[in-house]
Amino acid sequence: MSKAFQLIDRFSEDVDFAVISGDMSGNQVKMLLSKLMKEVTVGFAEDKSFADISKGSKYRKQAFSYDALVGLDVSVNPIPSRIIVEISAFANPFPYEKRTIEPFVTTYLKKQHLEDVASQYHLEPFELNVLSLKQTLCEKTVSLIRFSMSQDPLASLSSKIRHFCDLNALMTIKDLEEYVCGVEFVRDVETLVKHDQAAFDDPFGWKGLKDLTQSPLVLDFENLWEALTPRYEENLSAIAYREIPSSERVKVSFLKILDSLRTINLTKSSG
């Protein structure tokens, strides 16, 4: 959202890839994910201290460290000198569109009229297939619903606190705000929930969710958000390079999404 669409003004330490596996066998997918992880992390050293590692047959998540030339302590630079790479064959990466990606360093060099330096270090803009904004909105919404079904919704939602900020940014686009209020959004969320219920076993109550109003996020959002607000303000302020949206503004945006979510009945839609 920051690099392809310039919608959010914050740094990120993770890179997410979705693999379109088609008719590939399970073993072929596993080998492809392993090969991709090696190719996109050439020159980096794996961070063995990273605990949330996964090397499954359809999902890989690893952290890689790099040399930080600017020696800032954690109080000044809270973003660790590492990149978290996630490659998934679980995802449903449709629809997508081709977007031009320009590194932050390249943007700076252009402003300084140093395009030759960008070329020297192979920092020219490049194209990538990027998930559409509608699908991004649905995926972040469903992710929050799924994580809210854990035994400790507050802790789980805290780990996904940036999704709330991202959803607020998406809701500033008039077409997306209108999309959320329509039947297309309801249908797309229903489809994605069913897809993710088939793909993910955790948390415990996720697969048995039949009505989104059973989700603590939908059922008790205002109280949850009040408890999450300090985490939102602390976490986002640390990685943003412009002022972050107020917690009240983020709350109002998500309430609009909730209005549509409350109309979804998974049992009815599957019958």
Residue spans for each PLM region:
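Beta-strand-loop-alpha-helix segment that lines the small-molecule cofactor/substrate pocket
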Residues: 17
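Structured mid-to-C-terminal alpha-helical surface segments
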Residues: 3-9, 20-271
